[in-house]
């Protein structure tokens, strides 16, 4: 185990469920189930295949001799034929009818479609879990004022909950895209070497209705209601591009959220979970590094970059197909799913344990609120008979002086400066009345309530389990 390379996605980051789904065992069992479905459909539609042969195939689906398959593949240099041979060894009565009329892509491509569909459904649950956590967080802090930033510079007030809805909305868009991909996935079926189904015309004596019915039955067995109308030897590789772009979008949303949390943790406003015995630094014992969010960003970069593989593969299919897609897809597709799974697991863990330091949030608001409130102060002073242009200049001058003082490490004294200006005709009490943070958050609470209400039905049947991360 320690003398050969192992992908960190499998050893450190991805879930046991996703690792099982993309294991060689699941892959070959899926191939065998496809061979069973083919033989059964051919038998039911009149080809000379017996129930005994189909039964023996069904009984041996999980009895896989991987050593035998590896030895055979070394000899014949063909993975599918190696497994046809190995399957026939344990189901000798059916050995002669395995893979009848099919080409390799019958099992490889349909098998991938099944695995990708199941993997997307698994990711969907993780995505919904993150969204549910964020919805609860947004609702909890719907009205807590916090300093908003544009260009990462202090702007107007928002609320902690409203900011979380921005992350939530990104994930909602990802969910919509994922559902679109799932809804439009189709089965390849058993279409022959160039998609013409010529071999089945011979097998079924030219009966095209039987060919269509065979494909319908096989697709239905695996939960697909449609096959692609036309194809070459493979299913359209545009689907791979669509899938990886969907996973990339999830990475983009996770990266954005995690990066925001990292910025806020720097200011000690919000912190990701930190375990009791967790060590932040080998040298600086006091450190509380945002390790989870940093890892989300790191893995998300890989996920976004991985998506570039599929468009290049889809663009070089060469007429009815070429094999130069194979090696790339063996890596880029499973790794994309494993990476998306890892990122969502981390995002679920982080959003389940986000901690808001409300006193620091309030302190930051108090520090900048005098600047934010200057427009309101200006309007109030004008109502009391002041000159708008003169007052604007006073605010500008006092703001610059207060800012210069803050750059020297002193506290903000803008209010005191304005109260001392005769042009304002406002005393300290008047100014304090105009400095209620809740008066500067606009419709944030209302917006949070409306958006959370919109997404809540999505969580109706969600059974969320606490996510543990390995390291």
Please describe what each predicted stretch is.
Residues 208-233:
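Active-site-adjacent "gating/activation" loops or surface patches in catalytic cores
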Residues 271, 393-401:
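Active/binding-pocket-proximal capping segment
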Residues 77-80, 127, 131-134, 164-178, ...:
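Alpha-helical transition-metal enzyme core signature, strongest for iron centers
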Residues 162, 241-249, 376-384:
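Short, well-ordered beta-strand elements within core beta-sheets of diverse protein domains
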Residues 234-269, 278-339:
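A conserved active-site cap/scaffold subdomain adjacent to cofactor or substrate pockets
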Residues 139-161, 271-287, 320-327, 352-372:
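Glycine-rich cofactor-pocket loops
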Residues 1-202, 206-217, 280-281, 291-295, ...:
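A helix-coil-helix interface module used to build multimeric assemblies
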Residues 302-388, 394:
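Long, amphipathic alpha-helical stalk/connector segments used for oligomerization, subunit docking
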């Amino acid at each position: 185990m320690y003398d050969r390379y192992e992908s960190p996605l499998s050893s450190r980051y991805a879930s046991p469920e996703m690792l099982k789904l993309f294991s060689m065992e699941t892959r070959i069992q899926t191939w065998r189930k496809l061979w069973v479905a083919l033989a059964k459909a051919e038998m039911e539609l009149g080809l000379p295949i017996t129930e005994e042969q189909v039964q023996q195939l069904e009984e041996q689906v999980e009895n896989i001799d991987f050593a035998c398959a590896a030895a055979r593949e070394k000899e014949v240099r063909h993975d599918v034929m190696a497994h046809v041979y190995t399957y026939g060894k344990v189901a000798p009565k059916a050995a002669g009818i395995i893979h009848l009329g099919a080409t390799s892509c019958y099992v490889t491509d349909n098998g991938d479609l099944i695995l990708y569909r199941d993997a997307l459904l698994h990711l969907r649950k993780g995505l919904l879990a993150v969204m549910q956590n964020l919805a609860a967080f947004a609702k909890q802090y719907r009205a807590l004022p916090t300093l908003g930033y544009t260009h990462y510079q202090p702007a107007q007030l928002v609320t902690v909950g409203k900011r979380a809805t921005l992350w939530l909305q990104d994930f909602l868009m990802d969910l919509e895209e994922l559902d679109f991909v799932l809804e439009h996935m189709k089965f390849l079926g058993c279409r022959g070497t160039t998609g013409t189904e010529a071999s089945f015309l011979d097998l079924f004596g030219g009966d095209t209705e039987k060919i269509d019915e065979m494909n319908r039955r096989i697709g239905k067995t695996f939960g697909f209601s449609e096959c692609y109308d036309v194809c070459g030897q493979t299913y359209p590789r545009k689907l791979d591009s669509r899938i990886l772009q969907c996973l990339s979008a999830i990475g983009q949303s996770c990266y954005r959220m995690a990066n925001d949390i990292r910025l806020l943790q720097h200011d000690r406003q919000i912190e990701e979970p930190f375990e009791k015995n967790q060590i932040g630094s080998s040298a600086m014992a006091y450190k509380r590094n945002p390790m989870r969010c940093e890892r989300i960003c790191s893995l998300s970069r890989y996920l976004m970059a991985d998506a570039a593989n599929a468009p290049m593969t889809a663009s070089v299919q060469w007429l009815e197909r070429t094999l130069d897609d194979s090696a790339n897809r063996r890596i880029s597709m499973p790794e994309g799913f494993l990476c998306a799974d890892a990122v969502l697991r981390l995002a679920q863990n982080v959003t389940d344990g986000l901690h808001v330091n409300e006193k620091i949030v309030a302190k930051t608001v108090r520090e900048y609120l005098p600047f934010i409130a200057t427009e309101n102060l200006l309007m109030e002073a004008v109502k009391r008979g002041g000159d708008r242009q003169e007052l604007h200049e006073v605010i500008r001058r006092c703001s610059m002086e207060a800012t210069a003082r803050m750059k020297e490490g002193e506290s903000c004294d803008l209010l005191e400066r304005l109260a001392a200006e005769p042009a304002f005709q406002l005393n300290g009490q008047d100014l304090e009345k105009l400095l209620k943070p809740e008066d500067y958050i606009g419709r944030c609470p209302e917006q949070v309530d409306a958006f959370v209400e919109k997404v809540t039905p999505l969580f109706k049947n969600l059974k969320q389990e606490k996510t543990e991360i390995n390291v």
